[in-house]
Every structure is written in C-alpha cells, then in structure tokens.
C-alpha cells in the first residue's frame, strides 16, 4: 500500500486497527468467561477490509 494515503482512508484504517482487539480482561472476569473473544476479530490475511 502507498505511504501517502488520503486522510479519510488513514482514519478508517486506524479505526479498524483499534477495533481488531480482544475484549479487555475485566470483561472476561465480569462475565465469568461467557465472553472470551470478540466476534468482530479480523485476520489481516484471511479477511480483507473494504476501506
């Protein structure tokens, strides 16, 4: 990908990067491990973004 990105695309990629994380530990503890992983996790090679 090009180094020089439009600002809108850069912001969308940053938002996707931030949302691609596990839930916090306190959520797992509070729900007694009922919630252990995020349904919206994305692997960089398997699923591509439409950004």
UniProtKB/Swiss-Prot annotation:
The keyword Ribonucleoprotein applies. Keywords: Ribonucleoprotein, Ribosomal protein. GO terms for biological process: translation. The keyword Ribosomal protein applies. One of its GO terms (cellular component) is ribosome. GO terms for molecular function: structural constituent of ribosome. NCBIfam families: PRK01242.1. Belongs to the eukaryotic ribosomal protein eL39 family. This is Large ribosomal subunit protein eL39.
């Amino acid at each position: 990908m090009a180094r020089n990105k439009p600002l809108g695309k850069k912001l969308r990629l940053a938002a996707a990067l931030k949302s691609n994380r596990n839930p916090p530990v306190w959520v797992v503890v509070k729900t007694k491990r009922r919630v252990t992983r995020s349904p919206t996790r994305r692997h960089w090679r398997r699923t591509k973004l439409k950004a």
